[in-house]
A protein has these predicted regions:
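Conserved phosphate/anionic-ligand binding catalytic regions in large, soluble enzymes, centered on
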Residues: 26-49, 152-171
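Short, hydrophobic/aliphatic alpha-helical segments
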Residues: 12-30, 151
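Polytopic transmembrane helical bundles with strong interfacial aromatic enrichment
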Residues: 12-15, 130, 177-180
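Amphipathic alpha-helical coiled-coil segments
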Residues: 71, 75-82, 128, 135, ...
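A structural-propensity feature for long, helix-poor, extended segments
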Residues: 59-97
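Preference for long, well-ordered alpha-helical segments
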Residues: 138-141, 153-212, 218
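Short, Lys/Arg-enriched N-terminal segments with co-localized hydrophobic residues
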Residues: 1-9
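Amphipathic alpha-helical interface segments
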Residues: 89, 93-162, 166
Length: 218
């Protein structure tokens, strides 16, 4: 949760850009990379929505309407979700820090603290994993939009893809660092998919970049 000058608490997504950047630059533990990744995905989503609108509202780009509608459907799912993930990521990390501050004098306290730490760190991995999955969902609809969408906005598709790719790979870093401290049999589903998501991200991103360059220089 961010705090404005004067002590007002508010969500990251409700801050001005200047306020959020100031919070991100501070020495406070949150917001951090996971929140920044979710915000980047939100920016990628917004850029994509702009391109879909510019495509759908112009009959000149009728050949791209289907691709635009598909991308728009994905964006409608992501638009509000990315802001939630940005907030949840910070809250999850704050919970991790609180769990480490739990008392550890008695055996019961030690056991409770250990279980709480594991639970909070697993949650701190699950949040950015969702960001990565949603980032791939957006990336997967951008190549067709670059090929068939409004040609005047194809560079914006490229920027959206770069932001989405950064969001995916950045989120995966946060997944890995939180899973690293947990037993190997914890978060198995995430562990088994990290490399595949990262590889798919690179592959799809390159395809989108190629499509953007081809469209610009055709």
């Amino acid at each position: 949760m961010g705090v404005r000058e004067g002590g007002e608490s508010m969500k990251w997504i409700d801050m001005t850009l200047a306020e959020f950047q100031l919070a991100l630059a501070s020495s406070e533990p949150t917001p951090g990379g996971g929140t920044a990744a979710a915000i980047a995905l939100g920016q990628a989503t917004s850029l994509t929505m702009m391109v879909t609108s510019l495509t759908i509202l112009n009959t000149k780009w009728a050949d791209g309407h289907e691709a635009a509608h598909k991308a728009e459907e994905v964006c409608n799912e992501l638009y509000l979700r990315t802001g939630d993930l940005a907030q949840l990521d910070s809250e999850a990390f704050e919970q991790v820090m609180k769990s480490f501050q739990m008392p550890k004098t008695t055996e019961d306290e030690i056991k409770k603290r250990k279980n709480t730490i594991r639970k909070s760190m697993l949650n701190a991995a699950e949040i950015p994993f969702q960001t990565a999955e949603l980032g791939m969902k957006l990336l997967n609809c951008l190549e067709e939009l670059a090929i068939r969408g409004n040609g005047n906005a194809v560079s914006d598709v490229g920027v959206a893809a770069l932001l989405a790719s950064a969001a995916v790979k950045g989120a995966l870093f946060n997944v890995e660092i939180n899973l690293q401290s947990l037993p190997i049999d914890t978060g198995v589903g995430m562990r088994s998919n990290i490399d595949k998501i990262r590889l798919d991200c690179s592959k799809v991103s390159r395809s989108v970049m190629h499509a953007v360059h081809e469209r610009i220089h055709q």
